[in-house]
A protein has these predicted regions:
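Conserved active-site-proximal phosphate/metal-binding subdomains
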Residues: 13, 29-62, 68-228
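Short acidic active-site motifs
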Residues: 6-7, 19, 72
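Conserved radical SAM core fold
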Residues: 7, 26-29
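Active-site glycine- and acidic-residue-rich loops that bind
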Residues: 1-10, 67
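Short, ordered loop/turn segments at secondary-structure junctions
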Residues: 3-4, 24-25, 89
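Non-cysteine beta-strand/loop elements that form the S-adenosyl-L-methionine
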Residues: 17-25
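A cross-family glycoside hydrolase active-site/sugar-binding cleft signature
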Residues: 1-2, 22, 62-64
Length: 228
């Protein structure tokens, strides 16, 4: 995983078979290893072509971070990526195993609802900002080193979630979570209309159907030469 072009060159020089170019928008833990300066880390749109140029056509570059629909996939391919890695979208799939508290927060996800924080594990990771993150600040020098921070919080998280509260919950997702939620609700509405059913709009599309939909959207965008 490379979060800068410098890291991509290092990985290439050390014989990796492929590189995941992880933009600043990506959910979950950061893969940075040559720099700890989070403020200087590029987003996916800027990172992918620089990683592609850094390694040439010798190994594939996989784009990751903020890619939530076919438009994002098409954009990554146009920037030179050989493939994409998508995570947050699948949190909304029927097979998703995220807990009820996490699901409730995902349903109301929006574009400015995530932060990079070291509070939960001692390492920077992107997720929905809960009460703990808001009160301690997303990045704190008081946090124990990885992985001790996560162990210390487990009991608090479990007790709060038993009460349906997300105060101490690590709810990893990327900056595209709001778009993922909108797409999931649209798929749910189409399902309900087709099957004359009602119920939860999110978490009804299977991972297989989601993958097919995303691929079809991307192919349509690439075929037309525009992202609509």
């Amino acid at each position: 995983c490379a979060t800068t072009a410098q890291e991509a060159r290092w990985l290439h020089a050390n014989g990796v078979d492929g590189i995941i170019a992880q933009g600043y928008e990506a959910g979950g833990h950061r893969g940075n290893f040559l720099t700890q300066d989070l403020a200087a880390q590029p987003g996916t749109l800027a990172l992918v072509p620089q990683c592609v140029d850094a390694v040439g056509d010798e190994i594939p570059v996989i784009a990751a971070g903020g890619i939530a629909d076919g438009r994002g996939i098409a954009a990554a391919i146009m920037l030179g990526a050989s493939a994409v890695q998508i995570g947050t979208s699948y949190l909304f799939s029927k097979e998703s195993t995220v807990g009820s508290v996490h699901r409730a927060e995902l349903r109301q996800a929006h574009d400015s609802g995530t932060v990079l924080t070291n509070i939960f594990s001692g390492k920077p990771a992107r997720g929905i900002a809960c009460r703990l993150v808001k009160e301690m600040g997303p990045i704190s020098d008081l946090v124990p080193p990885y992985p001790d921070a996560g162990v210390a919080l487990k009991r608090l998280q479990h007790r709060a979630e038993q009460q349906g509260r997300a105060d101490f919950s690590m709810m990893w997702c990327g900056q595209g979570a709001g778009l993922c939620a909108a797409k999931a609700k649209q798929a749910g509405q189409e399902r309900n209309a087709r099957d004359r059913a009602s119920g939860d709009l999110c978490f009804v599309e299977s991972a297989t159907d989601m993958t097919i939909r995303l691929a079809d959207e991307a192919q349509s965008c690439l075929a037309m030469g525009i992202t609509q």
